[in-house]
Every structure is written in structure tokens, then in C-alpha cells.
Amino acid sequence: DLSPYTLYDEPLAPLTGTQSQLPVILSEYRFYEISDIENYLQLLTKTPEYFRSILNFEHTKSESGLFMASYTADSIIKECRDFVNLKESNYLYSSFVERLEELASAKDGVLTEKQREAYTRQNNVYIKKYIFPAYEQLISGLSELRSSGKNNNGLCYLPNGRTYYEYLVRSETGSSRSIAELQNLANTQILSDLTVMQRVLTGDSSSASSSITSDIFSPQGTLLTESDPEKILSTLSGKITKDFPPYPQIHTQIKYVQKSMEDYLSPAFYMIPAIDNTSENVIYINNGHLTDNLSLFTTLAHEGYPAHLYQNVYYASLHPDPIRCVLNYGGYTEGWATYSEMMSYYFSTLTKEQATLFQRNSSVILGLYALADMGIHYDGWKLADAAAFFHTYGITDDATIEDIYDLIIADPANYLKYYIGYLEFLELKKNAVNKWGDNFTQMRFHKAVLDVGPASFDVIQKYVFK
């Protein structure tokens, strides 16, 4: 369905684009043998050619009147500049040395000191010769094209843009519902969340309740004391044993986004491990975005247990057909991660009332982003319309609203993967409660959806209830 719309796709979105993701993927390229080092260095030499192909694609988009908004181009140009300006402090230098050290310690004698020095020199040369020039090339190409875009608004302003958005949403979320049905589903959930929050806030006039009321407007960090990611992951892995199926023993490494790149990467992300080595896992934390301990706790649930890391490792332990590891079902993976994140509020040391307030509030905010995505790209909202919508819900900071608007323009349907995927899991759960009655348990439901693995929701429904 999406094939006629190839030029509507955008490989260079902020946060999720190739320019952001490639360096991280390169820095996580594992060295198991000497040949892996050679292959990695060869990959570096291909970067200019790869970026040239992206620029050719952007030129074709421009000629068809489909180039990105000028402010999106400006943001990507600035990101590329900052990346190049890191020079010798760029993490592609340090991560290479670390990976050589890991190989040398894992396989004694496989790498001599002389070889390590030679490979390090070669890597240093290649970064300067291939990586930085590729980014310079991107800066130059995007600067030339930046004002050639015909549309600074949503997809519906492009020819057949609404039809494309319908296909895109179906592809990104795995949901077969129409946009109107999705809007209705989101509005219903937001109303439910707000009603529950209101009930918690007004249901008890005791001192406990008044402290909740004051706490929700203060930094969330006052509520949780634990700030060590490894201890939090350990806590989370212990909390899921009752309601989630067991998973194999694994090793997880916590890494941190380089400070100078914090603005350009997500608050945290899980690196999907090699298909034949799921025991080694990496989670990146972006301290620039995670400013309090509750956010850290719920984010580590989203990236770790019982979300991305757990789901990947558990599914791999079932030995699925390898093709399943290549197929991309963002609605399932991000929906499951959001469902898990929402559940994690109740795994924390918060009181039940506090957990309910923060979880429902988080759900509402994500729901508003999802409605704004559909409003902007399907109903044609401009910035003023989006601002009016957010103002209705008490979000009045115009700079924040503009940032949200710009992100939604640059990456259509991205928020829907998370929120609609989450709502589809909630709908599946309601169906399971109705169909299984007294035989429903959290464990049975979780095992059923995890055993099916990433797929569209109509397929999951079919297999869970067959």
C-alpha cells in the first residue's frame, strides 16, 4: 500500500533519523573476531556513498515538492554540525578503543598490542577521511535544499497526503482501525484517565491525599530515592516474576549518551542484540532528558523489564523463524513497552494513589500527543490549532507546544506507535478478561501476547483467542 508513496518517506527525521542513529549503531558494532574489525573499518569507508544516496533521495523529494519543512532541515543541519564539531572527543573514537579492549580480554592472544595500535590509527584516519566528510556533505546538501519544501504543515496538505497518512498509521501501529476510530479510542481513554485522576484527588480529604496533590506539582524526583540504573533494573526484574513468563539469564550493560549529543537522541534506548547472541544487552541513558528518579525508573521499565529488553530476550528464547526478527511491527514493540512502562508505576515505592496519578497523567500526555499527530497530519491543524488544543488541557507553554508541533511534523505517526499500540494491548486485555472469565490471569495474558511475538493486532487477536 505504501509503495506509491516512497518519496513521502523521510530518512532524516530528528531523534529517529539516520544522522542520529548511524553513529550509535556503529559504536555498538561488536568485535568477536579480527575479521569484524576489518569489516567495521570497511563500513566506515562506505558512509559517504550511503549519505550521497540519501541526498539523491532528498533531491528527488525536493523536485517533487516533497522536501521537509525548512525548520526541520535547520534542526538536522545543526545536529550534523555539532556531531562534526566533537572532533577527537567523538564517541566513535573512544568506543572503538573499548571494543578492541573487550576483544583482547575475551580472547587472549587474538590481538597484539601492535595490531591494536595499528587498528586504532586506521580508525582515527577513517573517521576524519570518511565519517566527518559524509556529515559535511549532508550539511551542504541540506543547506542547498532547505527552502525548497512546499509544505511546512501536516501530510494532508500534500497531494494524496491524507491517504498516505492512513496507510502510514496502519503500517506504524499495526492497528486496522480507521483514523476516526483511533481518535475515538484515544478520546475515550483520555476521559477515563482524567476521571480516575479526579477521583483520586478528590476522594480523600486526609493528609495523605493533600500530600499527593502538592507532590504532583513538584519534581517527581522527590518521590523515589533510588537513582542507580543497575539497582533499578534489578528491582524491576524481581517485580515481574509473578505476572510474566520466565526468561533466560542475560548480561545488561548501561551506557550513557555523550553529553554534547544529548539534545539529538531519545531519553533512553535499548540496542537490539545480535540475532545469535541475545545474552549481551545494552541500554543507553540520556541524562539530558531524564531529570528525576521516577522518570528514570519508568524509562528503565520501558527499555528493560518488562518491556524492550525482556520482550526481545523472551521471544528469542522461543527460537522463532529468523525472518520474524527482520519484520518491523512498531505498534507491537512500542505498544508493549508503553503498556509495561504504565504498569511500572505500580512496581515502584509510590503509594497506590501516587502511582495512579502519575501513571494516568503520563497516559493522558501521550494521548494528547497522539491526538495532535492525527489532528496535524489528517485534519490539517496548523500551529495555532495545536496550541488551542493543548491549551484546553492546561498545557500553555507556547515554546513547548511549538517543539511538540515540530517533532510531529518531522516524524508523522511516531507517537501513534506508542500510544495506539498501548491502547490496542489494553483492548486485547479487556477481550481476554471477557473471554476467559475466571480463567484470566495476568500471567496467562502476558504469555499469550508475548508468545505470538511482534505482529499486527488483528493477527495477535486471532492467535491469542484461537
Region locations from a protein language model:
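N-terminal maturation segment of proteins
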Residues: 1-466
